[in-house]
């Protein structure tokens, strides 16, 4: 091996590296028994912090779920608001010209 061969070594193509990384991620997700992402508890905590900046919420009245539907993951966040908070949400929605807010 000459010194020039050392400098001419071919680097792996980025597509190959990306494919290998994706295979690792897919294998890791498939191996997880619950199918729940690692980041879900942290995501739930951060979402609750953001919501609590704007509304008073009861943490027991919040649910976060991830559902798989074919090749799509759906993140569902349910927050139960008090009646006064619902009225404020409806008023804000009507001012913005948004569609009616669904009642529970």
UniProtKB/Swiss-Prot annotation:
Gene3D superfamilies: Cell division topological specificity factor MinE. It comes from Sorangium cellulosum (strain So ce56) (Polyangium cellulosum (strain So ce56)). The gene is minE. Keywords: Cell cycle, Cell division. Pfam families: MinE. The keyword Lipid biosynthesis does not apply. Prevents the cell division inhibition by proteins MinC and MinD at internal division sites while permitting inhibition at polar sites. This ensures cell division at the proper site by restricting the formation of a division septum at the midpoint of the long axis of the cell. This is Cell division topological specificity factor. HAMAP family: MinE. SUPFAM superfamilies: Cell division protein MinE topological specificity domain (SSF55229). The keyword Kinase does not apply. Belongs to the MinE family. One of its GO terms (biological process) is regulation of division septum assembly.
């Amino acid at each position: 091996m000459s010194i020039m061969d050392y400098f001419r070594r071919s680097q792996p193509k980025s597509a190959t590296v990306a494919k290998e990384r994706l295979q690792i991620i897919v294998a890791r997700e498939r191996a997880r028994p619950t199918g729940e992402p690692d980041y879900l508890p942290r995501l739930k905590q951060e979402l609750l912090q953001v919501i609590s900046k704007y509304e008073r919420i009861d943490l027991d009245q919040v649910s976060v779920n991830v559902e798989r539907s074919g090749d799509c993951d759906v993140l569902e966040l349910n927050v139960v608001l008090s009646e006064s908070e619902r009225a404020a949400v409806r008023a804000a929605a009507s001012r913005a010209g948004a569609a009616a807010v669904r009642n529970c």
